[in-house]
Amino acid sequence: DKGMICASEQSVTVLESVYKKVKEEFLYRGCYFLKPDELEKVRKTILINGALNAKIVGQKAATIAEMAGIAVPPETKILIGEVESVDISEEFAHEKLSPVLAMYKAKTFDEAIAKAEQLVADGGYGHTSALYIDTREKEKMEKHAAAMKTCRILINTPSSQGGIGDLYNFKLVPSLTLGCGSWGGNSVSENVGVKHLINIKTVAERRENMLWIRTPEKVYFKKGCLPVALDELGTVMHKKRCFIVTDSFLYKNGY
């Protein structure tokens, strides 16, 4: 729906080694890369007085371009701004809820993760992140998952469709209401489904936790057993410690 799904992509960070190929693919798919002067015009259209311009939400890329006073092919699918700053002062770093995408370049995988971390921090913790990678690179996948404070971490999946569940995975419940956990100030960190709308009663009868004790291999008892027991434990069984159970009555009576 032209970026209106809250899980839709807002920014993409690309490794320098494949940046040119990714850019070519975007162009092939009908995206439009903004020129420097056009970039500034779209910046002023994305935010109005520091807040998202509601007029761009869910609009076509060409319509947004027209609002900004620039001309793009009418069939343009996404407006892409190549920017450097991931700071909140960069308009393209914000959630845009429209076919407008920020594109960043990173020299290393670690740098790409750092940029993504900052974008998540600025845009709001807990929502969704996506990683496109060779799935044999498990170490990188784990590093990305550990760094992202997002409740949905998608692999090789378009986030707008993948985040709402069912279409590209079977781990996320189909839903358009996506929980962001305590990171995002929500009570749940998963996709909200039927189970979250049901009141569940639990009848709990009293039960006691089971207790148990492990007894020693040998237990010595009867009057006068202590010297024999200590000798056997030390010389035959080579034990260095023992536990003696007694009380004043037993002690006074020679036990």
Roles of regions detected by a PLM:
Residues 1-87, 114:
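ALDH superfamily catalytic-core signature
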Residues 3, 120-127, 238-243:
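Short, surface-exposed connector motifs at secondary-structure boundaries
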Residues 14, 133, 157, 245-246:
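Short beta-strand/turn micro-motifs composed of small residues
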Residues 20-21, 137-141, 248-255:
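Short, charged/polar "capping" segments at the starts of alpha-helices
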Residues 70-209:
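Conserved C-terminal structural/oligomerization subdomain of aldehyde/semialdehyde dehydrogenase
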Residues 210-255:
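ATP/NTP phosphate-donor binding region
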